Amino acid sequence: YPIAGHSENWPIRSQNFKRWLAARAFEEMGLAPGAQALEDTLRVLEARATNEGPERAPWLRTGSRDGKIYLDLCDASWRCVEISPLEWRLLERHDAPFIRSSAMRPLPEPEAGESIDTLRTFLNTAEEGDFRLAVAWLVAALRDRGPYPILAINGEQGTGKSNASRILRSLVDPNAAPIRATPRDERDLIVAAYNSHALVF
């Protein structure tokens, strides 16, 4: 739905959409809608979306179409970065079907000109091959569908494994819980995957 000069995507039953709908009703009619009127409207919208609306798969942090990758900055203006084989550009307005979880955190606005080698100073990699594997994981993490590589960071205690994991995660999918405890079962794993693009344990 359109709001403050941009578009946002939220489930119909979410608090964000309900607040927007109530505000629109007040703008149009000058009256606050009652609880039953709001509920009736939500049911109609659900039915129309299910039976009449075009179906589009939602994107969580990343998505792709027409040979381009889109990365949600997760900021208040819902901006995203469009990445093609030759360039990237910041999109202030777009129709990308991004959705968000409450744990997702914003990425900074990208800046041109820096080399990937800048990342070396933040990662304690012993070999050139290890650094290249980390970069390969970052690039693969921008894709919206798998298969994905699994990056296993090994080292003795105190060698910066957790710090490296946080840094790599923060570059593609910052989260309120950058490193999670190992899931106890498949259900925990599915819940974690549903709310995040990248999983770090």
Each predicted region: which residue ranges?
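Hydrophobic positions in the central parallel beta-sheet of the AAA+
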Residues: L199-V200
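Segments of Walker-type
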Residues: A4-G129
